[in-house]
Regions:
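Conserved nucleotide-binding and Mg2+-coordinating catalytic segments in signaling enzymes
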Residues: 1-16, 37-51, 59
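Short regulatory alpha-helical coupling segments
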Residues: 9-31, 62-70, 88
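Short catalytic/binding micro-motifs of nucleotide second-messenger systems
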Residues: 24, 67-72, 104-116, 129, ...
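Residue-level recognition of strand-loop junctions within catalytic nucleotide-signaling folds
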Residues: 47, 87-90, 107, 130-131
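Short helix/loop segment flanking the catalytic signature motif in cyclic-nucleotide metabolism enzymes
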Residues: 57, 70, 84-104, 140
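Alpha-helical scaffold within the catalytic cores of cyclic-nucleotide enzymes
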Residues: 62-63, 94-112, 143-145
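A short pre-motif secondary-structure segment
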Residues: 74-77
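Catalytic-core segments of nucleotide cyclases and related cyclic-nucleotide turnover enzymes
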Residues: 96-99, 130-173
Length: 173
């Protein structure tokens, strides 16, 4: 089912699809990427402009995410201002490129309040790749979430790819 505000997949649908894509990736020996993203300081948007404006921003992000992924990918709203992208047949560099494109386009979003005030937001993104060391949904989620935390810790509005579980250095842009 879908999130009623953004019309993206909801949290439950996301987890069902993630499990299915992991099984498919293992079965066909294909790559799979997960990108988690969080709108930076989103509470300030709601506090300063009200929840109606916050909802307008979330809807715009939903449309943007749908336009940034292929038809076989999945964009989901996990709750609040947290979103995720499931990217089948996508390697580390491909996932980084998608995440960077999303981050950049979110930064370019402009939403106007009824008073004509322009509201902008930024996003932090963390990505992880299914691998020998990251082989199930829990591990993939932890790896992507760790990368998201790293992006936030490095100042927000950036992409971080977590490859520590596969022995590669973190890549942050």
């Amino acid at each position: 089912s879908t999130d009623p505000l953004t019309l993206l997949a909801n949290r439950r649908q996301f987890f069902v699809r993630l499990e299915a894509e992991i099984k498919r990736a293992h079965r066909h020996a294909e790559s799979l990427a997960l990108v988690m993203l969080d709108l930076d300081h989103f509470k300030l948007v709601n506090d300063a402009h009200g929840h109606a404006v916050g909802d307008q921003v979330l809807k715009a992000v939903g449309v943007l995410l749908s336009s940034c992924v292929r038809e076989w990918d999945m964009a989901a709203r996990l709750g609040g201002e947290e979103f995720a992208l499931i990217l089948p047949t996508t390697d580390r560099e491909g996932a980084r490129e998608v995440a960077e494109r999303v981050r950049s386009r979110i930064l370019d979003l402009r939403c106007r309040t009824d008073e004509g005030i322009e509201v902008t937001v930024s996003a932090s993104c963390g990505g992880a790749i299914l691998s020998g060391a990251v082989s199930n949904a829990d591990q993939l989620l932890v790896a992507a979430d760790d990368a998201l935390y790293d992006a936030k810790a490095r100042g927000r509005d950036r992409v971080s790819m977590d490859d520590t579980l596969v022995g590669l250095p973190k890549l942050s842009t």
